[in-house]
Amino acid sequence: LTYEQIKQKYEAHSNLYERAIEIIKNNDLIKEFPIYYEVLTDCSERLEQIFKSLLLISEEGKIYSAQILYRAIIELFFKTFFLTSKLSTDKNDESAEHFKVHLMLSEWLAEQMGYLEMTDLINDIENKSDFVQFIRDKFPELKEFDKENQKEISNAIKKFNIKNMIAYIRESLTDKEIGNYFTKILPEYSRASSFVHGGPYATYIVKNLKDKGQIEKELERVVGVAFSCTCVAKENCLLSFKLHPDDMKDFINELREIRKF
């Protein structure tokens, strides 16, 4: 498919999705899993923003930038699919809450760790400062924060490691062919990571694609995969509502039909 055809498909998919959400809101349908709805909606909105940016830079032939956005889409898609899989098996908001609260805290703590390491370097401190004490001193409202809290956060977010998510998805799917498909994306994720981290392998990949005249072909492939990921993530948002099974089936089937290649 050309970029223009993918744009048209995505616009049709988005319009139907918005219509479905509007019907849900107008009928005041219950969010059976409100935290899942919040998390999945947020993820799908971020995916949409990244996908639209990917389309723009791909049309300009910017393969390096496209790979960076592509990697972000793959990771965010895995998170939404993993959360949807957990929802279907657990039937509660626990994993979504871990994502919303514990993962955010973990990311915030990582930022604070960066500040601590920066301070140690600036002040030429030879022995590494105690992180827990650093948090307590800097944020008096967190005076009760201790290593047990750190451990709790760490344990809660282990499930969001990319390999752990893929392993869970693969095991939870009855269709092993689909499960194997997710597993096969791991090398793709790793390859795109070289672009994110500015590795020399990324430079080699770009040079190789240029030499073979395959930049355009690779960009079209990446955009196609990203399109499917973004659409599926939006469809999964509907699963957090109490809908009549037939209504859900009709919406999902029509959305799936639109995104078919």
Language model region names:
Residues 66, 86-97, 243-250:
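Short, glycine/acidic-rich hinge or "gate" loops at secondary-structure transitions
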Residues 22-85:
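Long, hydrophobic/aromatic-enriched structural stretches that serve as scaffold segments
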Residues 68-76, 97, 209-215:
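Amphipathic alpha-helical scaffolding segments
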Residues 1-32, 100-261:
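Secondary-shell segments that build the walls of catalytic and ion/ligand-binding clefts
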Residues 71, 77-120:
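Internal, hydrophobic cores of structured domains that mediate oligomerization or house catalytic pockets
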Residues 65, 84, 91-92, 203, ...:
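Residue-level signal for alpha-helical context at structural boundaries
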